[in-house]
Amino acid sequence: MRLKDRVAVVTGSGSGIGEATAKRLAAEGAAVVVVDLNQEGANRVADEIRKAGGNADALHANVGNPQELEDMVRFATDKFGRLDILHNNAIRLYTGRVGEMSLEHWRKAVDIGLTSYWYATRCALQVMVGQRKGAIINTGSVSGLAGDYGLGAYNAIKAGVINLTRATAIEYARKGIRCNAVCPGAILTPPILKSRHSQPELARQTEAAIPMGRYGEPIEIANVVLFLASDEASYVNGTFIVADGGLTAHTGIPSVAGSGPDW
């Protein structure tokens, strides 16, 4: 087991990528704190981990509240005696054009998607520095590498996450702490699954734009997080891994050479 005797905290792990990651880390031997705003979701995931033979505790927390992030790290250390892995994954998506989004929604989006990542990292570092070892993995996005119509706040937040990752990595590398990010593309999380049913044409166009011709599965992102959390990534620091089926490898310009994805 790659993570035997290690302790992991995963935010936003009551569903989607966070759920897949919590289960994947637990399957490799980590004791996992399943953190989510949805208590029912957190309880379900923790129960499923335990039924599979793993070690997990559920924790209800609003990551937009700094005190609850402090309590989150304290919960992990009080329960398990240490903290080895932090996966910042929680997000709240607010849509709207840059010139039309309300200040209230902008601030809420930044609080959940960026400020919470910084503050959770800050809290975790207070433990990890003393241990002289730790791995922090942030969920970025391909939307942090380019713009999307109607997702200006999300684009800004995820770009911020990528550079927060880099800053953390260089500042704490000599303390034995690594910090990296995973940047997913279109993944079959609950919101995407819902939109596939309500907007089937958009789903078709999205799949057509992905060179691999399909959406990604949450487990495919969880596998990247597992790698970054493990000793197999011992010299990987301050970078991000894109997992998007080749989406960002393409210029977006239609084929001019008479060949396409099905040639």
Regions found by a protein language model. Give the residues of each.
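Conserved glycine-rich cofactor-binding loop
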Residues: 7, 14-16
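Substrate-binding pocket helix/loop in short-chain dehydrogenase/reductase
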Residues: 97-98, 105-110, 202, 206
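Active-site loop immediately N-terminal to the catalytic Tyr-X3-Lys motif
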Residues: 99, 146-152, 174-175, 213, ...
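Active-site helix of classical SDR
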Residues: 121, 157, 165
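Alpha-helical segment proximal to the catalytic Tyr-Lys
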Residues: 126, 170-174, 234
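Residue(s) in the substrate-gating loop at a strand-loop-helix junction
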Residues: 141
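C-terminal helical subdomain
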Residues: 181, 200-232, 236, 243-245
